[in-house]
Amino acid sequence: MTALRARIAAAAALAVAYIALTMAVAAGLFNPLDKQVLQGFLGLWNESLHPLFQAIAELGGLEVTTLLMIGLVVYLLRRRFGADAWVVLAFVAAQALELFYKATLYHPGPPRSIAHTDGPSITELVSSSGPLANSFPSGHMVRAVVVYGLIAFVVQRLAPWSLARRLAIPVATFVIVLLAFDRLYLDVHWESDVLGGLLLGAVALLAGSVWLDRPLPGGDN
């Protein structure tokens, strides 16, 4: 119970941090730093690496992360953890909050004359123009933190192989960090968008882990 309370407190602290970041972004306080980081990544650009980073972007795309989340739910159901499968709501809620902030917070992404072509995704149809064209927070980062974090959490507890349990969190962390770099390298997001996605995703991940580790009636979990 102590560990669960600590996780709940951490989720609350991250939620407060996310709200504070959102207010700072709305006030334009991150604009100078966003532009400095963008300029730094423009200097790193190598056209020959473009296809590679487009492929990396797919790891955080709606299509791949949704399939992975469905796979996690199916796995939990097959293992007779039916109630645990409701952790999918953490993913759904995070997606809903991402869309809410993009629809209500005016924060255009880097100019399209600068940004490089992102990995193909159905989200491009609704994010290229209209009310969802704002870029805060990064949807790729939100999805990556929630999905890869939850998969790592489940693997660490249920995988029959000790190597898989040991590698679960490092691999998930590597994928998340790689996607954060990818968002900035392709110049499709400001650094504040990436931070926002990390924070919002972390809140949803912690909420999901609390559900998975909840005390069960008549026993300890």
Regions found by a protein language model. Name each.
Residues R5-A13, M69-L97:
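Interfacial segments of alpha-helical transmembrane regions
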Residues A17-A20, V92-F100, F174-L184:
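Aromatic-anchored segments of alpha-helical transmembrane domains
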Residues D118-N221:
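Membrane-embedded catalytic cores of phosphoryl/pyrophosphoryl-handling enzymes
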Residues A57-R79, R143-I151, V155:
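Hydrophobic alpha-helical transmembrane segments
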